[in-house]
């Protein structure tokens, strides 16, 4: 069979694409996922289903690619969580449902991609969500992804202290962090109603997986793109030790910021010198593949809590956050502060870790404490992804080059000073 579309990766984007494309009954779609499939909420394991603070969701071996990356040339390697499960990273993430600023999308428009202006993407933000707290021009009321905020009366003591400390230091009140004009401190929007991580699996595939024109294949590793000349026409896929070939009119890579460029390069699209050095036949010399690797670097200031102060490890770890513009920056809300409680609940978390992960988390029984995280939302620094082998099972080298520009360093230092000052506030005296 030749499909109309083959989508690689059933994650945050792939599951949505498959659902939307199969709205037309005469359009056939094959959705391929490397990890396991959980067809309903009852079959989800706890670390995927529970979205409050399982502690294991982003570091366990069962649903994570277990990538490691280099933050900077001098820093120790860090885990790079990427979902290997139906729903992709939306099935293991922290569920922060925070939009970019309008200027972010308008910048893409100004670069020539006029379908990505804020005014053009806003209808789709509204279409995808059911916001339980806000309505009006900027929010949806009947979309597949459920968004909510923790009510003030349900904030834990330390989250209230963070909010009050921010207000005392001059942050304005920002109750709707997804409003286009917002800045300041307020409740963080999450896609976890009743503590359930509402992934694209639950939100989108639940309403489409019954369709006869949608085929979902889990536990399948895509090894290579097949080309007819320079046009993609199929894929080589491995499942349970057997190799298969599938064909489609259009091949869509939706495997994430690591696996998509990796697959392109393994298939012969990328920097020619890098590919030939690994014995990969060059289909298209494209030095941009693997370049311009970007992320939101986060630093944290940590405090131990007073003896006798009890924090529930099953309570929400984040409820409140603040968006602000760094001093001297022309990028509005380029910084974010989040208050987090942290705790490892019990030894069961350690039991679910791979040996590799345990070696990088030797002190797995982290003392209960709190931290204020400083996130650089639009960094200047860029990194790169580089193949180390022609074997799809060997992860590429990930070099992020965090804080490699003076402007990023200035904003990061200022953010850490703000975090430390907030943590020393009288509101945390208890």
What is the predicted role of each segment?
Residues 1-430:
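N-terminal redox-cofactor-binding region of secreted/periplasmic oxidoreductases
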